[in-house]
Amino acid sequence: MQSKRLKNFLVQTKICSSGRKAPQRPILMSTLKVMNIGIVGATGQVGTVMREILTQRNFPIDSIRFFASSRSAGKEIEFQGQSILVEDAATAKWENLDIVLFSAGGQLSKELAPKVASAGAVVIDNSSAWRMDPDVPLVVPEVNAHATKNIPKNIIANPNCTTMVAMPVLKPLHQEAGLRDLIVSTYQATSGAGLAGVQELSEQVREAGEIAIDLTHDGQAIEFPPGNSFPEPIAFNVVPFCGSLIEDELEETNEERKLRDESRKILEIDDLAVTATCVRVPVYTGHSLAITAGFNNPITAQRVKDILSKVPAVVLDDIPTPLKSAGIDPTFVGRIRPDTVLENGINLFLSGDNLRKGAALNAIQIAESLLR
């Protein structure tokens, strides 16, 4: 069950929706109540961004607790003028928390989220552990905030970062013309593989140094340091393999399956046809997607632009890039044009920050939606 504090707060507090960039002013219309918040994985890449966004958005916090693995337990983290001791998630007590944000991997979420939820908190989980559970809503607040009205397990799932980039774009187009097919190629940043992925790219670029130009005529000209995050060198390269291989007749990766299954659940289109190829690229932050979308009803490229120009979570841009989107909340969309293969088809190119809207921001927006 939800804590009494959270139930009372749901009635008494209203929240404004986010703007296009990280807000510089309070978004709360009322601060009659404040919440006890926890972050599991607080010292990690996404947990760090969560801490920043809670401050940027003036989330109503009474107290906050940080949890991490035993390696990070005992450290102190500065937050809004306070020094907060990091607790060991494995041995922590979970009483007197209202909302707990999880970003510590699927295994830990499977183990700890039910314990936290049974102690009275609402869990908002960033891992893949609960996304396809029929009793756990998978939520993008701009798309399906209504799903948070029923949370039988006190757990709400955050979608995969790649799926997230596309949802604010596809939902209004589906409402207009009825989405039928998606053909997607992704260009996923190294930060999607965690801090280790970012470090691996940085080390390989540094190793190449001034002789990187030698790769122009010989792809083996540089012996890169061995890496663990990607199956091939990522510097100056693209790797058409994200995640892990699923051993079935489709021979797809789990990243490709997530895009299909999560899109169907969030958009509530059970028969949506989705095929994807997920590619890792030498970018630090910002996932991009090349999408060909087929619709049940005719829709023009100009109509797509008109619709998306009115969506707060979307920015129209002639040439969307990861560099433009990094550190920014909305999805950048461009290269909008008719497709000549799919019936009623439209081509689009999207870029979005996989750490902000792709993970931390969406989790906090879910928390805000609970307070409406």
Predicted regions and their residues:
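Oxyanion-binding "anion nests"
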Residues: 229-278
